Amino acid sequence: MASKTDSASRDYSVIGTRPVRHDGVDKVTGHALYGADFSLAGQLYGKVLRSPHAHARILSIDLSNVLKHPEAKAVVTFEDFADSPRPSRAYAQGAPVTENILARDKVFYKGHPVVAVAATSPHVAEQLLSLIDVEYEVLPAVFKPQEAISPEAPILHDHWANEAMPDDTEGMGANVAAHEVYQQGNAEKGFETAAHVVEREFNTKSVHQGYIEPQNATAYWTPEGRLTLWCSSQGHFSVRDNTAEILGIPISAVKVVPMEIGGGFGGKIPPYLEPLAAVLSKKSGLPVKMYMDRTEVIQATGPTSGSHVKVKIGVSANGKIEAATANFKFESGAYPGAPLAGAAAAVFAPYAIDNVRIDGFDVVDNKPKTQAYRAPGAPIVAFAVESVLDDVASDLNMDPMDLRILNSAHEGQRRADGVINLRIGAEETMTAVKNHPHYNSPLGDSPSGKKRGRGVGMGFCRNNTGMACAIANVLPDGNVSLIEGSVDIGGSRTAIAQQFAEVLGIDVTEVHPYVGDTDTVGYTSVTGGSGVAFKSGWAAYTAAMDVKTQMIERAALLWDCSIDQVDYKNGRVFHISDPELSLSFKEIAGNMPETGGPIVGSANMNPGGSGGSYSANIIDVEVDMETGKIDILRVTAFQDAGTAIHPDYVEGQMQGGTVQGIGWALNEEFFMGSDGAILNTSLLDYRMPTSLDLPMIDPVIVEVPNPGHPFGVRGVGEANLSAPLAAVSNAAFRATGIRILDLPMSPDSVHSAIDKTS
């Protein structure tokens, strides 16, 4: 189902259709090559020795027994990397941390890489790890942000004790990496005038992105000093740049070939294995292939932050928000980089609030370094804010959506993080929820006597953009080879090709999109931040406009007239003064040799204006008051897509994000031992929702065009994860009358809350 909010008048021929994805046949027939499918003749296999401790000092590493083994071809420790500074508090999310690739002199989490080896087979490489003798001094560890900020907590990074602390962190310990403050108006005065104030504290645990394909890399470092990497990542240019920096070699010496990728959700942006495979290849003189197993993925790759969040909202008697504050402490794991800015942008974004203060703290602890996960930071704060708003609505005896619509953000208003809204779809998305049959239908009673409830929640992602390039080669038969630089995770190749085809009025099946390697196409930023359809789509649009201009020039040459006498429409050029003179796209393509040679369109750009996206969910649940188990009965997902280039893919993103959000709300968490070991390191034990757990999710596309894009595109890959957490929580609250403040709402935690209330 699609809601055409204000886009019905737009007349597109390709955009808004649902063509078969260009890579679909290869993927369903098994012909698509993923990273682990790639091999080179004579390759070695690399494996990693990981720390058995959550926090320890490395006293010595004895490699003598390994080096004696006839099938050991290379061994790598931190000393083999280029000299790099120790991570400071200023390290941002996504910055390469060499010490996370291999530990320097301390390990900071169980699973932290210490040594890498290469051997003639993966089994031998695994055996070699047992020959390495590492002596550790085990140190006290800390695993929760609320505990890590204490001055008494063990300090992870010793040198931080001598660095200046972030502002306004009095009474906190040296594990605080950053404190960010955003404010407008005067929140304290706003609360003084408020007729009703609600304040709550929430806790969420680390969850993993749960991509189906583990990390992998194959490297070959030639004798001439040229490094080629084949890997599955969310950005091969980022892998190239980060690997070159970690290894201390020129970017020009590294080529990265992108393989197909089996999911990422933000977790496959940083390099993990690529630098290791590269150095092992350099030392052995042979190609080296590496891949993680699932235990390694969960033990040692970035989850999202665990958190402690405090939200306070004050409203007038009629529900108008007078003031709001948010204080959140996000764990970043072993190294700094928690998504404070993303959380600050999202926390109150759906609403117009004059008086706001936001405090975000980045806290390191003894867990794997966190990485991005669909709208980094936003789902956590949306869970808190949307839960508080539902409590406000309940206290005021007000419809939850009426409260939200009354306070909805609009164009021209300033977000708390300083951004002034352009055209946005907050109210349109809320109104779509309010008017939907799901929201207005009776919930019904459970035949088994269980408690039922219906909840709503709003979400937001600011969306990002970045640099993007595209090259369009027109072929003599009128087809087009379109080379772009964005790794395809969610069907973006087809969405990019649709935007190209729309400009030229040709069939999208005649456009053949490819993801080029780092030597083939210009720099393109990572597939993340919901930016691909926006930035690479815009690059395709610009390349198509370049082709269109050249088509007009070729026709003018054939007709011996000026270019202002030629126009282009619906895949044909025609003479303005003589309608009988007309040529199709294919006809001009066939005449390229006679009119000047190849037609190649290109684009290199760094567009701004990606435009934020709003989402919402209506979720019905059933709660078993005896066991605490929550079952999902019905789900409707809403999202402002700006313009839905390929509605199937938009709906798929909405459904997928909703599933992940429900998993975050109900099941997903790391079970940690007292020693910092993650105990559920398989997908049997790390419980993600399956089709057996959920009903069909009904997607509703809202279209409020983004004025910052030629076709009005907004990214749709992330905001959809933010709303389900609160929608499930609010549904459970309305079913039971009990507000559960911690995620996940597992049967055990819900049952405990019921017992306490009883």
PLM segments and residue spans:
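Flexible, low-hydrophobicity surface segments
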Residues: 1-172, 197-200
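Glycine-rich loop/linker segments at domain edges
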Residues: 17, 23-26, 91-93, 97, ...
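Extended active-site and interfacial segments that coordinate phosphate-rich ligands
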Residues: 22-26, 130-139, 143, 234, ...
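C-terminal catalytic domains of large/alpha subunits in multi-subunit enzymes
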Residues: 69, 78-81, 248-253, 283-288, ...
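Short acidic, glycine/serine/threonine-rich loops at helix termini
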Residues: 85-90, 128-131, 231, 240-242, ...
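Conserved catalytic cysteine-centered active-site region
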Residues: 105-106, 250-252, 256-258, 282-293, ...
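Helix-loop-helix junctions that connect adjacent transmembrane helices in secondary transporters/permeases
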Residues: 155-247, 408-479, 679-701
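Thiamine diphosphate
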Residues: 241, 260, 264-285, 289-290, ...
